[in-house]
């Protein structure tokens, strides 16, 4: 009986385990959904920002890149920009997708919520992000830390 239960569990659990790591099906319109936890400790700039946040990057099958970012900004730092850069953990890299830039006004709100559609720079596609997310990071810049206040590697 135990052997029968084990075989049954292995037969039906395996497809579930395999399916959980697969990007959304093409019929759903989404190529991949990526996340990054944003914190100063991840920055290469020496940032001592107390802000923390989360970014979600959704890449649609047509290549559209949508983003949603929430930042808890306890000390009301002035945030001026946010981007996706290409570089591994611990390395600063070039901007490949602008997220939060002018003409969006700088903000020092305690709870910052940004969302929209982002246009990647030439040479970068949403498919690149999906294929190797850990090669990219999101970071947000403040007036005190113009090189980057909070950062998180995409996963």
PLM region spans:
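Bacterial N-terminal signal peptides that target proteins for export
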Residues: 1-8
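Metal-centered catalytic cores of metalloenzymes
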Residues: 4, 15, 20-82, 86-155
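Hydrophobic alpha-helical transmembrane segments of integral membrane proteins
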Residues: 11-12
């Amino acid at each position: 009986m135990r052997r029968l239960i084990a075989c049954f569990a292995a037969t039906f659990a395996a497809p579930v385990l395999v399916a959980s790591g697969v990007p959304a099906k093409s019929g759903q319109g989404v190529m991949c959904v990526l996340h990054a936890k944003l914190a100063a400790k991840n920055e290469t700039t020496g940032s001592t920002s107390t802000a923390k946040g989360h970014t979600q990057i959704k890449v649609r099958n047509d290549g559209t890149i949508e983003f949603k970012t929430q930042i808890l900004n306890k000390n009301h730092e002035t945030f001026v920009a946010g981007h996706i850069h290409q570089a591994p953990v611990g390395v600063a890299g070039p901007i490949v997708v602008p997220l939060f830039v002018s003409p969006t006004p700088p903000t020092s709100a305690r709870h910052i919520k940004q969302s929209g559609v982002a246009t990647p720079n030439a040479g970068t596609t949403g498919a690149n992000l999906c294929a190797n997310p850990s090669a990219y990071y999101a970071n947000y810049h403040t007036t005190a830390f113009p090189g980057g206040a909070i950062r998180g590697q995409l996963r």
